[in-house]
C-alpha cells in the first residue's frame, strides 16, 4: 500500500458523496411534485406518455395496487426480453449471425436483467445480437433500475405520511425515474465515455491484420450507451465477457473513476433523499458516514491484501510483490480495490478485475458486502434494505429500554416486525439452501473450476451474488448448465421480489398510522450512538448467519496459505 493509493481511494469516494448530496435533494423534489428546472421540457413529454398508456397521474395507489402494477409490468418486460433472446437469430441487427439463445440460458438472462442482477452465464459479444443488446439488455437495465427506485419512493411516502393508504402512482414513478433521472444522466455519462475512448457503433465486428501477419476478428458494437446505464443503474452486465476489464468498456483510469462514481451516484443520493422525506438530514449524514466508512474499510482491506501478494510465491519461489493476477495494469491496485468494494457495496456486479483471482480475505470483502446487502445497496432496493434493518434496530433498542418501538413517529408493531423479519430471513435462505444443494449434487460440483475450499467459495459467491441482485462472479464456476441456469434464476427472482413485497406491505401499514408526538423518551435514530447500534445489528446478524460458510471458504483458504 502507498500513501498516494490510500488518498486516491478516499478522494474518489469523497467526490462521489459530494455529487450525491445535491442529487438527493433533486430526487426528493422530483418525486414529491415540487417544481424543478426540467419541468418545462419534461412535463409535456410525461403527459404524452401518460395519455399513451392510459394513466391518470393524479390517482394514487395503495400498496397492493402499487405492487400489482409493479409485478405485472415486470412480468411483461421479462417475457418480452425472453422472446427477443429466443428469436434473435431471425431478427434484424445481427451482423455476426448469432443464433437464438437456448431456453434455460434465455430464462436465466431474462430473470437476471429484470431483477437488476445482470448475472451473465454467456459471453455478450458471442451470444447476443446488437438488437438483443439494445432492446433486451439495455432496455431492462433502465426499467429494472427504475422499478427499484419507484419501490423506494413508495416506501419513503409510507414512512412520511399518516392516516392514508396512498403510496403514490407506480406508473408516474416509473416514468419520472426514466425522464428525470436515468435517461439524462446516462446520456451525459455515455458522451463522457465516448470522449474517453469507449466505442459506439452498429457496424459488425472488425477484421484486422495483426503484426504477426494473421487475421483477427474484433468484436464491437453500441458499447458506450450500454456501459452508461450499466453503471448508473447498478446493473453490471457487460457488453463483453470481460466486463469492465475489457479496454472497450473501460479504456483507462479516468473511465474507471467515472464508472465507480456512476454506480454509486444514485444509491448514495437516495440516502440523502430519505433524509429529506423524513425531515431528518442528520439521519442521512449519520447513515452516509457510517456506510461510507464501511465502504472505505472494505476497499482498504482489498488493497492491503492484494498489495501484500501471495505468501506461497514469496516462500516457495522468492517472488515478492503485489498479487497482479487477474488485474489490469492500466488501473493499478488502488482503483481496482475500490472497484471491487464499490461494485458489491452498490450491488452493481461490474468487474474491472477477476474476483476469482483475489487473495482469500480480499475475496471475502465482496462476499460480505453482498451478504450484508445494505452498504448503500442497489438502486432503490438498497435503501429498502437499509430501512428494513433500521426498523429491526429500533425494535431491538426499544425492547432493551422497555419502550414500545417507534420510528419517525410511527409505532412498530407485530405486523411490521413479522414482515421485516421475513424480508431479512429470505436473503440468507436463498443463499445457503441452494449452496448446500449444489454441493450435494455431483453434476453441480462438476462445474467448479477449482477443487477444495476455493471451489466451494465459487459456488457460495454465485448464489450470494444472485440473492443480492449483484451479478458479479468468481468466474471459475461454469454457470451455463441447466442446474445453475434454473437455480440461480430462481434465487435472483426470490431475492428481488420477496423483500420488495414485504417492504411495500410495511409501507402500507405505516402510512395508515397516525404520527405520535415526540417526547423526551423517544429513541433518537439520527445520532451516531444509534448508528453504531444499526451497524452492530446487521454485522451480528450477518456474522451469526454466514460465518460457518465463510470458515469453509475464504477464511479456511487464507489459513491454508499460512
UniProtKB/Swiss-Prot annotation:
Name its cellular compartments.
Answer: Cell membrane
The answer on whether this UniProt entry bears the keyword Acetylation reads no
Q: Which UniProt keywords apply?
A: Cell membrane, Ion transport, Membrane, Potassium, Potassium transport, Transmembrane, Transmembrane helix, Transport
Cellular component GO terms, alphabetically?
Answer: plasma membrane
Q: Identify a single GO molecular function assigned to this protein.
A: P-type potassium transmembrane transporter activity
What PANTHER family does the record point to?
Answer: POTASSIUM-TRANSPORTING ATPASE A CHAIN (PTHR30607), POTASSIUM-TRANSPORTING ATPASE POTASSIUM-BINDING SUBUNIT (PTHR30607:SF2)
Return the protein name.
Answer: Potassium-transporting ATPase potassium-binding subunit
Q: Organism source for this protein?
A: Alicyclobacillus acidocaldarius subsp. acidocaldarius (strain ATCC 27009 / DSM 446 / BCRC 14685 / JCM 5260 / KCTC 1825 / NBRC 15652 / NCIMB 11725 / NRRL B-14509 / 104-IA)
Amino acid at each position: 500500500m502507498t500513501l498516494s493509493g490510500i488518498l486516491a481511494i478516499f478522494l474518489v469516494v469523497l467526490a462521489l458523496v459530494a455529487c450525491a448530496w445535491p442529487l438527493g435533494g433533486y430526487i426528493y423534489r422530483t418525486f414529491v411534485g415540487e417544481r424543478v428546472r426540467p419541468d418545462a421540457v419534461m412535463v409535456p413529454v410525461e403527459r404524452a406518455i401518460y395519455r399513451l398508456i392510459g394513466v391518470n397521474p393524479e390517482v394514487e395507489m395503495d400498496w397492493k395496487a402499487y405492487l400489482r402494477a409493479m409485478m405485472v409490468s415486470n412480468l411483461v418486460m421479462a417475457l418480452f426480453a425472453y422472446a427477443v433472446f429466443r428469436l434473435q437469430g431471425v431478427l434484424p441487427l445481427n451482423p455476426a449471425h448469432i443464433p437464438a439463445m437456448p431456453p434455460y440460458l434465455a430464462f436465466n438472462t431474462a430473470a437476471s436483467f429484470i431483477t437488476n442482477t445482470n448475472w451473465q452465464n454467456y459471453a455478450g459479444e458471442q451470444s447476443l445480437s446488437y438488437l438483443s443488446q439494445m432492446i433486451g439488455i439495455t432496455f431492462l437495465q433502465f426499467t429494472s433500475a427504475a422499478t427499484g427506485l419507484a419501490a423506494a419512493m413508495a416506501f419513503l411516502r409510507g414512512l412520511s405520511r399518516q392516516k392514508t393508504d396512498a403510496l403514490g402512482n407506480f406508473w408516474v414513478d416509473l416514468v419520472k425515474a426514466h425522464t428525470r433521472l436515468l435517461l439524462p444522466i446516462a446520456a451525459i455519462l455515455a458522451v463522457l465515455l465516448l470522449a474517453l475512448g469507449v466505442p459506439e457503433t452498429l457496424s459488425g465486428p472488425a477484421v484486422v491484420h495483426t503484426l504477426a501477419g494473421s487475421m483477427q476478428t474484433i468484436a464491437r458494437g453500441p458499447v458506450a450507451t450500454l456501459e452508461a446505464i450499466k453503471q448508473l443503474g447498478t446493473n453490471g452486465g457487460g457488453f463483453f465477457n470481460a466486463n469492465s476489464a475489457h479496454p472497450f468498456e473501460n479504456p483507462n483510469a479516468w473511465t474507471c473513476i467515472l464508472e465507480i462514481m456512476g454506480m454509486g451516484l444514485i444509491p448514495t443520493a437516495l440516502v440523502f433523499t430519505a433524509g429529506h422525506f423524513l425531515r431528518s438530514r442528520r439521519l442521512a449524514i449519520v447513515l452516509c458516514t457510517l456506510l461510507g466508512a464501511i465502504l472505505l474499510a472494505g476497499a482498504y482491506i482489498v488493497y492491503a491484501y492484494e498489495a501484500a501478494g501471495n505468501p506461497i510465491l514469496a516462500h516457495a519461489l522468492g517472488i515478492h510483490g503485489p498479487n497482479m493476477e487477474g488485474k489490469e495494469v492500466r488501473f493499478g491496485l488502488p482503483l481496482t480495490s475500490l472497484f471491487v468494494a464499490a461494485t458489491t457495496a452498490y450491488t452493481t456486479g461490474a468487474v474491472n478485475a477477476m474476483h476469482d483471482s483475489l487473495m482469500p480475505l480480499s475475496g471475502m470483502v465482496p462476499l460480505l458486502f453482498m451478504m450484508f446487502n445494505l452498504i448503500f445497496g442497489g438502486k432503490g432496493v438498497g435503501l429498502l434494505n437499509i430501512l428494513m434493518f433500521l426498523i429491526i434496530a429500533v425494535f431491538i433498542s426499544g425492547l432493551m429500554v422497555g419502550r414500545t418501538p417507534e420510528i419517525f413517529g410511527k409505532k412498530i408493531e407485530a405486523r411490521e416486525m413479522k414482515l421485516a423479519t421475513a424480508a431479512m430471513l429470505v436473503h440468507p435462505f436463498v443463499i445457503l439452501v441452494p449452496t448446500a444443494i449444489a454441493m450435494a449434487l455431483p453434476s453441480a460440483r462438476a462445474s467448479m473450476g477449482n477443487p477444495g475450499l476455493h471451489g466451494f467459495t465459487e459456488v457460495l459467491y454465485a448464489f450470494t451474488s444472485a440473492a443480492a441482485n449483484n451479478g458479479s462472479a468468481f468466474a471459475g464456476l461454469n454457470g451455463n448448465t441447466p442446474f445453475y441456469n434454473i437455480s440461480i434464476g430462481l434465487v435472483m427472482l426470490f431475492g428481488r421480489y420477496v423483500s420488495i413485497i414485504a417492504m411495500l406491505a410495511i409501507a402500507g401499514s405505516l402510512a395508515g398510522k397516525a404520527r405520535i408526538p415526540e417526547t423526551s423518551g423517544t429513541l433518537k435514530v439520527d445520532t451516531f450512538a444509534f448508528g453504531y447500534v444499526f451497524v452492530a445489528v446487521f454485522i451480528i446478524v450477518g456474522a451469526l448467519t454466514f460465518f460457518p460458510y465463510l470458515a469453509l471458504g475464504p477464511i479456511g483458504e487464507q489459513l491454508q496459505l499460512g
